Amino acid sequence: MSAPESISKNPGRYVWFTTLYNARAYYPILAILFLDLGLTLDQYVMLNLVWAATIFLFEVPSGALADTLGRKTLLVTASVLMVMEMSCLLFAPKDGGWVLFSLCVANRFLSGLSEAAASGADEALAYDSLPQGDREQAWDDVLGKAMRYRAAGFVYAMIIGGLLYDPSIVNRVLPESFAISATFAHRLPVGIVLIQALVCLVITLRMVEPVKTHEEGTWKACCKAVSLTLETAKWVFTHRATRTVVVIGLSIDAVVRNFATITSSYYRLIGLPEWTYGFYGAFIGLAGFVVPAIAAKLNKRFGTLANLGFAAGLALVGLSGIIPGNSKWCLAPAMLLMMTMGFLGFTVSRSLNRESDSARRATVLSVKGLAFNLAYGSFSLGFSRLLASHPGGSGDAALRNALLWQVPLFAIVTGGLLMWGKWQFGKVRAA
């Protein structure tokens, strides 16, 4: 088989890899999965700090490794790490004390490491495998197909994960003699994702490296990547427009994303049946088709700061609405918060792409991702300490208390930053 023929299947393999890698059935029940294993909510939130810190530390070196060791090598590594992270969860002992917590920490570390390894390497390998003649149009087609497959996979995974987690639903379709326990049902979504991880490993092993991208050594490439990232970070945070967008954006994203990771715990708090969680996740996924269109219209009509203010306002309404946590009506503001993430992401990305020149655009977006993960991890740490400090422990009362106290903090910080942003943009216009 000639080289062009051998790499021609890479784009199709990329589509299947990115779908199976990202559409995970445990997403709609992620928080309660850890809680039902025996962790407290503050321990679970602390695990998110481990995940965010791992990505923060390894995102940049992984890009250099992909360029020196090869994109296929990084993707195979990401798949192996995915198998390991799922195995940690699948075999973690319920109420297992320090053994359970250690395996959960390992799961979050391996998950962050896997995502850092896969980040960008899959797209780069698929793009380089396309014919050079009409590569741009061909990539649009591949990317469009990948987005459709991911969206469909996400909806399917959300629904299946929520249904399988509830033993009462599973036992309705099984003969009485095959009835399963709640403990077994809770492992089913994890087992499905473990199978997906094994399929991802097979797919990546069958990929073909298009070209040897770099001749320089790995250490030199890592140093070069870190140097470029630091140089770009300096530009981002000294350039008024980009600095303002990133700082305001991360202040909103950190709080909203923290809630996104505990949604299943919140759904349980307001009394929603577990089997419905996946349908809410699927609804949010489908809303992702609508939110970008709304965001595009508002960003064309109003300035960046106005749209950031709109995102902050939506987030404040949502955060205020979820405080009671005692009624199914609290689901509406929770859904609003989830959709705010999409609007914020569109606004920040559009602004940074406009402000950055093509030579540094990819690194600017990478710096944005690093800054957002650092802020998210820091807020997760504070939120977990707030939960743990509650006199009654980290139960329902502690969660309601934490949800209450984050609202004035969010209002003060984002309000102050928006006023600072108005001053910064005023200086940009005056320059």
Placement of each model-derived feature along the sequence:
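Juxtamembrane intracellular "pre-TM" segments in multi-pass secondary transporters
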Residues: 1-11, 207-247
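Substrate-agnostic recognition of the 12-TM MFS/MFS-like secondary transporter fold
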Residues: 13-30, 47-64, 73, 103-168, ...
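Short extramembrane helix-to-coil loop segments that connect adjacent transmembrane helices in Major
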Residues: 26, 33-43, 172-182, 266-276, ...
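Cytoplasmic membrane-interface "Motif A"-like loop-to-helix N-cap segments
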Residues: 68-79, 299-313
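C-terminal ends and interior cores of transmembrane alpha-helices
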Residues: 80-98, 104, 313-326
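A membrane-interface helix-boundary motif in multi-pass transporters
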Residues: 165-195, 385-414
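Helix-loop junctions on the cytosolic side of multi-pass membrane transporters
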Residues: 170, 182-186, 190-220, 419-431
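C-terminal transmembrane helical hairpin of 12-TM major facilitator-type secondary transporters
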Residues: 305-348
